[in-house]
């Protein structure tokens, strides 16, 4: 399981299926050490987290031998500002903001891109509004980026759209980076409502998928290609 998580962290999703399944005996030589963290004991059960460290050169050699590209560079933290369009208004700090709530429910990732969410406190309300975030107000975005100590800000604007004629509903998510190596990069994603799907359900699904795609985009931009190296 630990090795699978390592592969998922480093290798683009499109190439993960090309790797052979490894027996435990093949994985063990790649492990440098492991330790138990966060131990919890009770009279009926024991809970603990295992932290594995792998030997970089052997993992690299395994991936290289199988012709798989991968990324190792960790991104500077990214502050995500989730703006939700509702009845003509743009919501960011308003309560409720279902898009912000959906992002808070996304499980923490051990990937290469640390995503941070705003606290939504008075300092946030003072420093930037939903309209300023969507408009890309450079001065205000720089203020919140510095306060949170991040390398870039990702504004993700979500809105429910209805197709003319068919009345089919979809959640459209437009993202744009400000600052960092991805500055100015934009993307638009559409998530169709399934039958009887609620708005709360689709924003949750969209948040998880966008989080995955943020990781995938970073890996694709930072791939190590061994044909260009001597290592």
What are the residue ranges of the model-derived segments?
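Amphipathic beta-strand/beta-sheet edge segments enriched in Tyr/Trp
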Residues: 1, 48, 55-58, 145-204
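C-terminal/domain-edge helix-coil "capping" segments
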Residues: 63-73, 101, 105-114, 147-148, ...
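A short, hydrophobic beta-strand-centered structural micro-motif
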Residues: 28-40, 81-82, 133-166
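Signal peptide-directed extracytoplasmic domains
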Residues: 9-82, 92-98
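N-terminal segment of the mature soluble domain
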Residues: 3-17, 76, 81-139, 146-148, ...
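Short, well-ordered alpha-helical segments
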Residues: 1-20, 140, 198-217
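Short beta-strands and strand-coil junctions in structured, solvent-facing domains, enriched
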Residues: 59-61, 88-89, 162-164, 216-224
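Solvent-exposed, acidic/flexible segments
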Residues: 52, 92-96, 134, 138, ...
């Amino acid at each position: 399981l630990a090795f699978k998580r390592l592969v998922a962290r480093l290798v683009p999703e499109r190439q993960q299926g090309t790797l052979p399944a490894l027996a435990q005996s093949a994985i063990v030589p790649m492990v440098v050490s492991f330790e138990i963290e966060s131990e919890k004991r009770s009279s009926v059960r024991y809970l603990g987290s295992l932290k594995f460290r792998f030997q970089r050169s052997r993992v690299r050699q395994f991936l290289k031998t199988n012709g798989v590209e991968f990324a190792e560079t960790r991104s500077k933290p990214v502050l995500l500002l989730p703006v939700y369009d509702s009845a003509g208004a743009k919501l960011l700090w308003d309560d409720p903001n279902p898009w912000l709530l959906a992002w808070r429910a996304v499980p923490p990732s051990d990937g290469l891109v640390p995503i941070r969410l705003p606290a939504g406190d008075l300092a946030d309300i003072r420093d930037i509004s939903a309209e300023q975030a969507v408009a890309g107000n450079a001065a205000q975005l720089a203020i919140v980026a510095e306060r949170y100590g991040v390398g870039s800000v990702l504004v993700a604007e979500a809105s429910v759209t209805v197709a003319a004629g068919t009345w089919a509903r979809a959640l459209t998510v437009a993202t744009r980076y400000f600052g960092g190596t991805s500055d100015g990069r934009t993307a638009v994603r559409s998530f169709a409502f399934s039958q009887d799907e609620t708005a709360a359900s689709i924003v949750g699904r969209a948040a998880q998928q966008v989080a995955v795609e943020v990781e995938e985009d970073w890996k694709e931009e930072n791939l190590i290609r061994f044909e260009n190296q001597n290592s």
